[in-house]
């Protein structure tokens, strides 16, 4: 009855209040409809490549114009790789098989990589001759003894295509480009009316102090491990094994108080490189506790997975693991579909889906 006696102003005021209440409830519901996925792992484990795959699979992908924007970076990656090998030739005391390649090495050495925006014919010829040199090939085979990008062989084997005047990077070229992540990159994408906000933070040691800001309201941690790093040393510290560093970081992350309510998903990445490398670089030489057969990538994968699972002190906490190849779009499409289902299952109550 009292409602009949309300003035027009009071009715309007009530209507506005009801609208505000409704909007607040909507905002609260929308906040719940956003999932924050934190991508963690040491440098070069494949986090940025994974974000690129999300853009290809669940976002707008890369147009011709977008891919053109990577041309300069592809060229720079090629020079960086060749310069790394030229320096390593000196350090490892490997001889060039062709005298002329000593001169070619000088030509490439003088290039200021940051200023490269095109490929000159003299540089292309020098790079091709160097890459064909048996000394450089020996140096490439010994790459675990120095720092060299995983994409080196991919780009150098394709130098003819890349040096074409009308070159536009392919999707695979874009996925392979190496640019160290500095700062924090966020990539939100919409899946089934739920926003997945993926956050990629720099993996190098100097970048890790920036992570702290990302720790609030994390739904899931996706931790990437490069399987192929079992025999490599850190870029920042040349006598520390990369996998030992990654393992220690994983333990720190999963025992952080912030993450006790976050699910943990482990991507054992670069399975393709492990398969290649395990044929000549034996796991037991770096992890003496490995008792499996040599040249067996499945045994190596199982051992490395257990290494990481053993870092988990809380046996109640499930770690969801997947073997991945971040440069393979179909593999990531398949794996992320499983990850999405896991995350949604774990958050059903939040989304009122039960």
UniProtKB/Swiss-Prot annotation:
One of its GO terms (molecular function) is GTPase activity. Residues 33-354 form the G-alpha domain. Residues 265-272 are annotated as: G4 motif. GO terms for biological process: action potential; adenylate cyclase-modulating G protein-coupled receptor signaling pathway; phospholipase C-activating dopamine receptor signaling pathway. Keywords: GTP-binding, Magnesium, Metal-binding, Nucleotide-binding, Transducer. Residues 36-49 are annotated as: G1 motif. G proteins are composed of 3 units; alpha, beta and gamma. The alpha chain contains the guanine nucleotide binding site. Belongs to the G-alpha family. G(q) subfamily. This is Guanine nucleotide-binding protein subunit alpha-14. It comes from Xenopus laevis. The gene is gna14.
């Amino acid at each position: 009855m009292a409602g009949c006696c309300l003035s027009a102003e009071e009715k309007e005021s009530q209507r506005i209040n009801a609208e505000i209440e409704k909007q607040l409830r909507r905002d609260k519901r929308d906040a719940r409809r956003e999932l924050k996925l934190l991508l963690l792992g040491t440098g070069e484990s494949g986090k940025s490549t994974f974000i690129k795959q999300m853009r290809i699979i669940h976002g707008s992908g890369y147009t011709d114009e977008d891919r053109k924007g990577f041309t300069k970076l592809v060229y720079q990656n090629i020079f960086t790789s060749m310069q790394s090998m030229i320096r390593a030739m000196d350090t490892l005391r490997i001889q060039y098989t062709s005298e002329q390649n000593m001169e070619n090495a000088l030509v490439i050495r003088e290039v200021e990589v940051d200023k490269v925006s095109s490929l000159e014919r003299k540089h292309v010829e020098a790079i091709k001759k160097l890459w064909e040199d048996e000394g450089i090939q020996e140096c490439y085979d010994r790459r675990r003894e120095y720092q060299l990008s995983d994409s080196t062989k991919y780009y150098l084997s394709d130098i003819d295509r890349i040096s074409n005047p009308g070159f536009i990077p392919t999707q695979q070229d874009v996925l392979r480009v190496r640019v160290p992540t500095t700062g924090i990159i966020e990539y939100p994408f919409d899946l089934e009316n739920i926003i997945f906000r993926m956050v990629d933070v720099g993996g190098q040691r100097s970048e890790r102090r920036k992570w702290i800001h990302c720790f609030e309201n994390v739904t899931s941690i996706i931790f990437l491990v490069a399987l192929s790093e079992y025999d490599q040393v850190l870029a920042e510290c040349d006598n520390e094994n990369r996998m030992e560093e990654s393992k220690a970081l994983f333990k720190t992350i999963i025992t952080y108080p912030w993450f006790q309510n976050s699910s943990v998903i482990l991507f054992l990445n670069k399975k393709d490189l492990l398969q290649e490398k395990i044929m000549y670089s034996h796991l037991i030489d770096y992890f003496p506790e490995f008792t499996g057969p040599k040249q067996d990538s499945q045994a190596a994968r199982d051992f490395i997975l257990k290494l990481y699972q053993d870092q988990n002190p809380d046996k109640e906490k499930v770690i969801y693991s997947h073997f991945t190849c971040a440069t393979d779009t179909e593999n990531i499409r398949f794996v992320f579909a499983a990850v999405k289902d896991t995350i949604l299952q774990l958050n059903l109550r939040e989304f009122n889906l039960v």
